[in-house]
């Protein structure tokens, strides 16, 4: 039979063996349907499309391939449109993240997947109740606060040395860290606590991981390749990650990503500014995790984004021409911004309420070129350090001066006061929950001044001044009143100072100290030497608040020490004062607990030593029995000379030692 004898059906079957049939994708999983768009004539179609592209392409990795407007006979839009993405994941993300988008006051855009219409059209008429899944409670990430050790006032801290990461309890009476969990290669670089202490962040080549709970389980994983920096929102609801990317795609940026902590969902991504303009944190968080903001790169104003939608506040930039810096209040929804002097206009500092953008206060300053914002942690005061040049008789006699503007933000009409410091400022810090300010200033680092000011009813008063100090950094106790003044990176001088009584508790030294960290209670403070900066004598010292060394730990290749933060202090100043007044009632209880704890630890240690002694004596007895059992063998061999039991004797030597001499005068007898 020749090939021409084969019929057509046989020929088709033969070809299919060599080439698979074409697979046609009949799904619409890359399409979404946007409803409630404005009804527009044909002349406005392109403008409407550009608006829709701007909205629905502003998601991480989203790329709009096409937009199809539904039209009527007069070529007017029908109020809905079809949008096609390059991949189905973008369509799913848009349906969940961009639903109910407020286009304007009259139009709220609704989004559905096009594939969902077939599901809704074939919906079963017979109701089937959903299956109930068993409730699985999530771990309590603040469980450690109810731990008996935490209730006794002990705090946790994390250390990194070599390849080890240790989480320890600070039980001071033990005299050493009590390790709760030790891990090897837990992170590739460093670790970081969240602001409330609920999570511990570890860094990896492909992203970061969050750990927490009683058993330190992995809470969530955030994929962001090359991530180097993390910034949590004040209440730990969101976090921002940064990874340096040389050529980031503006349509799908990957440098800066905002995440929802609990769900692990990526909310939005941003381009990073040029390297020479980059600062961290890249965004500033408002109080209550409500907004994030950063200055627009052309200095036209501030981009303020609402959470969790990550849309611009009022869909536009907050315009402030020439803005150089801004800062949120730590407790209120208000921000302060600075615009430098621009001849002939003076510089100005403004305090603005959000989201109304109402101006609360404004101060004009002639000749100011730079400003730094310093908020008191309760938001009651804002101190702005301004740098300006005061011109002398000639241009060569320009003398740099530093002035401060104090805003009383919680008082009616926000009163503003000014005060000046004679020399250049090295460090500035507010007392937590207090009214005192500490400033290090001077011309020479070997001869610095430390000035303490107090905000009073109508003025800012100098209350104390230290002279001829070799100090460069200020570390306030979290409870205020006490402050540690340090000279980091050099001699490691430490001065413990009480601002209430204006007295120094004393000075100490931790050579080549690279960092200081107070524990949340304010009872202890840690100084450490990190291997990242110094290669010898690395480790940490823990001091009491008045400068007594509690214990010292040296570790080879020691990198990091961080106390675990506690959640925000919930007690008011009135409640704190009541506790202070009744402290004697609690003192006996606490002393009894400490005594019982010490006895328990001593008992455990003594039991351990007794067990070791019993084990040693048992080993000796076993060896003696084996030795006696081999006596016939030794006699037969004649190689060893046994000890005659009669040669063993016990000698007791009595030693008299003079312990004490007392002179007693007896009554004279006549």
From Swiss-Prot:
Main location as per UniProt: cytoplasm
GO MF annotations, alphabetized: RNA binding; translation initiation factor activity; translation initiation factor binding
Keyword Lipid metabolism recorded: no
Any coiled-coil regions, as ranges: 568-600
Domain RRM positions: 30-116
Cystine pairs: none
Pfam family, any one: RRM_1
Subcellular location: Cytoplasm
Start-end of each WD repeat: 183-221, 222-269, 466-507, 509-553
Aminoacyl-tRNA synthetase is among the record's keywords: no
Quaternary structure and partners: Component of the eukaryotic translation initiation factor 3 (eIF-3) complex.
Function: RNA-binding component of the eukaryotic translation initiation factor 3 (eIF-3) complex, which is involved in protein synthesis of a specialized repertoire of mRNAs and, together with other initiation factors, stimulates binding of mRNA and methionyl-tRNAi to the 40S ribosome. The eIF-3 complex specifically targets and initiates translation of a subset of mRNAs involved in cell proliferation.
Family per record: Belongs to the eIF-3 subunit B family.
Protein's UniProt name: Eukaryotic translation initiation factor 3 subunit B
């Amino acid at each position: 039979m020749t090939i021409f004898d084969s019929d057509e059906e046989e020929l088709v079957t033969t070809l299919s063996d060599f080439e698979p049939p074409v697979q046609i994708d009949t799904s619409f999983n890359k399409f979404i349907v946007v409803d409630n768009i404005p009804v527009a004539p044909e002349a406005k179609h392109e403008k409407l499309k550009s608006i829709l592209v701007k909205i629905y392409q502003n998601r991480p990795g989203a790329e709009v391939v096409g937009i199809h407007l539904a039209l009527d006979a007069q070529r007017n839009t029908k109020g809905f449109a079809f949008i096609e993405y390059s991949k189905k994941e973008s369509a799913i993300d848009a349906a969940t993240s961009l639903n109910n988008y407020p286009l304007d006051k009259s139009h709220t855009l609704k989004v559905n997947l096009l594939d969902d219409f077939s599901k809704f059209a074939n919906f079963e008429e017979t109701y089937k109740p959903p299956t109930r899944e068993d409730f699985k409670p999530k771990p309590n990430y603040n469980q450690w606060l109810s731990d008996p050790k935490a209730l006794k006032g002990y705090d946790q801290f994390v250390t990194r040395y070599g390849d080890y990461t240790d989480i320890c309890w600070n039980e001071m009476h033990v005299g050493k860290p009590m390790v709760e969990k030790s891990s090897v290669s837990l992170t590739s670089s460093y670790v970081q606590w969240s602001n409330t202490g609920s999570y511990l962040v570890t860094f990896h080549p492909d992203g970061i991981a969050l750990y927490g709970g009683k058993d330190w389980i992995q809470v969530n994983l955030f994929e962001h390749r090359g991530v180097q920096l993390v910034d949590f929102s004040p209440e730990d609801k969101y976090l921002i990650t940064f990874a340096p990317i040389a050529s980031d795609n503006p349509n799908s940026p990957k440098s800066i990503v905002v995440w929802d902590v609990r769900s692990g969902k990526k909310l939005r991504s941003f381009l990073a500014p040029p390297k020479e303009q980059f600062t961290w944190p890249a965004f500033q968080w408002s109080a209550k995790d409500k907004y994030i903001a950063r200055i627009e790169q052309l200095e036209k104003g501030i981009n303020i984004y609402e959470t969790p939608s990550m849309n611009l506040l009022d869909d536009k930039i907050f315009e402030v021409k020439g803005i150089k810096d801004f800062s949120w209040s730590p407790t209120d929804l208000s921000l302060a911004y600075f615009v430098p002097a621009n001849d002939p206009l003076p510089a100005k500092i403004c305090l603005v309420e959000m989201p109304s953008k109402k101006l609360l206060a404004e101060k004009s300053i002639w000749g100011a070129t730079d400003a730094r914002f310093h908020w008191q942690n309760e938001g009651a005061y804002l101190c702005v350090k301004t740098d300006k040049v005061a011109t002398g008789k000639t241009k060569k006699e320009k003398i740099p001066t530093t002035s401060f503007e104090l805003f009383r933000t919680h008082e009616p009409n926000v009163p503003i006061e000014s005060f000046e410091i004679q020399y250049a400022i090295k460090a500035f810090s507010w007392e937590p929950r207090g009214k005192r300010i500490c400033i290090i200033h001077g011309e020479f680092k070997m001869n610095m001044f430390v000035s303490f000011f107090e905000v009073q009813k109508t003025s800012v008063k100098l209350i104390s001044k230290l002279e001829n100090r070799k100090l460069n950094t200020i570390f306030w106790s979290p409870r205020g009143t006490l402050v540690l003044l340090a000279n980091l990176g050099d001699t490691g001088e430490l001065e413990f100072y009480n601002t209430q009584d204006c007295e120094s508790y004393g000075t100490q030294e931790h050579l080549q100290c690279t960092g200081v960290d107070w524990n949340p209670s304010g009872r202890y403070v840690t100084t450490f030497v990190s291997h990242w900066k110094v290669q010898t004598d690395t480790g940490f010292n823990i001091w009491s608040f008045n400068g007594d060394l509690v214990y010292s730990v040296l570790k080879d290749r020691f990198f990091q020490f961080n106390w675990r933060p506690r959640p925000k202090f919930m007690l008011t100043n009135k409640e704190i004062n009541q506790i202070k007044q009744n402290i004697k009632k609690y003192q006996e209880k606490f002393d009894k607990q400490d005594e019982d704890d010490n006895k328990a630890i001593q008992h455990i240690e003594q039991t351990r030593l007794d067990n070791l002694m019993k084990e040693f004596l048992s080993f000796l007895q076993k060896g003696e029995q084996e030795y006696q059992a081999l006596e016939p063998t030794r006699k037969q061999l004649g190689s060893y000379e046994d000890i005659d039991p009669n040669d063993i004797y016990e000698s007791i030597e009595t030693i008299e030692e003079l312990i004490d001499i007392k002179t007693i005068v007896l009554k004279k007898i006549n």
